[in-house]
Every structure is written in C-alpha cells, then in structure tokens.
Amino acid sequence: MADRRYCCLHDFLSRTDEGREWEDILPVRKWLYQTPEQILIKASNGASDFGNKFGQPLICGSVLTFEHTENNEVYGYDKVIMLAGGVGYGTQRDCLKGTPEAGNKVVVIGGDNYRIGLGGGSVSSVDTGRYSSGIELNAVQRANAEMQKRANNVVRALCEEDVNPVVSIHDHGSAGHVNCLSELVEECGGLIDMSKLPIGDKTLSAKEIIANESQERMGLLIKEEAIEHVRKIAERERAPMYVVGETTGDHRFSFQQADGVRPFDLAVEQMFGSSPKTYMIDKTVERHYEMPEYELPKLHEYLTNVL
C-alpha cells in the first residue's frame, strides 16, 4: 500500500479570500524556490504519477498544517515535509541481514550514474538557502519508476525462492554508492571496481560517480556461486545488473579506478566506528498556554473556516 503525507504551515493556502483571521496567525514569508502551495501540488502530482507507473497507485494520504504563536514563541512546520512510502510485508527468514564472507560479490541493480543527487543528506538537514543555489539544486534527487519496478521485481523474485541467495541488501539513498555499498561490506571490508559501475555521463568526476544518488538502484551482496542465477532473473525482468566488486576481509572500503588509483580508500572503522560521539542533554521545560476561546453556537462557522 502506497501513501503520501504532508506537514506544512498555512502558507500552502491560496489566500484568495480576504479577512480570514485563522490564516493570519503568522506573517506570510518569502520563499526561495517554490511556495508551499506549489510544492504540495507538484509533489502530489509526482507521487501519484510515480505510483501509477510503478504499478502501485496511491490510495491514501494526509495533510497536516499547524502554526501557533504565544509568549513571543512561534511553532509550526516552517519547512514543507513530504513523506512518501509504502507498507508491505516480508518473511521472518529475510528480516535480518546475513554475515558477509570474503569473496562475496557486490552487485548493483538499476540505472546509470548521473550528476544529480549530490549532497542530498546535508542539504535536506539545513535551512533552504544556506548553501549556494548550485549546491542545493544539485542535491535534488531523481527517480525512474520503470527502472525501480524492474529492480523491485528482481528482489521480490529472490525473496520468493526456497533459498534466498542474498547475503545483504541496501537501497541507494543519500551519498549514493559510498553509503549503500559500504553498508554491505561493513563487517569485512570490500573493493569496488569503478570501471564496472554504469556511467550515464562520461564527464563525471570520481567523487560524482561515487556519491551521486539515484533512488532506482539497489545494492546487493551475493554469494559467488549464485551470481549467474541472479543474472538470469535480472535479464528476465530487464533490470540492468552489474557485478562491481567483492568483499575482501581486510576491513577496508575502497573504490579503485581502472588505472589502479583509489580516490576513496578508508578503514571500515573510520567510517562506522570512530566518529565523534554527540551527547545531547535533555532539559524538560514546562510551558503553559492559554486555552483557546470558542463559542459553541459558532461551531458551524468554525467548521466552515477550516474546510
């Protein structure tokens, strides 16, 4: 079941009618690229279009708006939030990842690399406009519903087999290959052959190849003896499949070019185990707000305002 949910300020409203006090809690602010109204309309259209192309139409959703000011404090969803996803099921057998061994093959299923979706993890976590427009627009992701459906069909076919040949699996999200594939080899290390990665744009730098985000790709760790079997399933589903590396057992994660140069070469513990710890000290602050004033005879008026 696919759905979408939105959280935003009242700014998504058109404000074509004057004198509606409940829309004027906060002053209308200026927006950098798109207004909340434009985002909700375009995101909704895009989500519905993607679901239809994928073959899983959106059948539910919601919109939540909130803004409040009191005691010189302002609360609200200042940044429009869109949550898109789905609800499915899996077997208990497949709920935990397996343990990788040296020699397991690193496989990528899905589309090519392009100069898009760079820095998405960083940009999505800060105020819009903090970085230059070039950085922010480069971070915009892409998704190809047809390609994602093909990759999904391969994964589903493997899950429905009596013996699932997948040792580990991870989707491509922020940071692209460097994030996805490192998750597969976290316990033992791995070497990725960059010449085996599918390149849609020959002008990409090593950083762009390693870190671009394309959400219709999946990373899998497959036992060597099962590679040809998985390849036949991928061919049946017309899903591009690439064997791009293998686990090494040396506890390093590296990307190596055809000339032997490694633009990315780190110990696994540097990526997962030695990051500075962040300590957050919680302090409970009790706040008291005035009860809203209302008159029961005006119930229908209030409903009309909201609807």
Residue map of PLM features:
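Glycine/proline-enriched, intrinsically flexible loops and inter-domain linkers
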Residues: 1-307
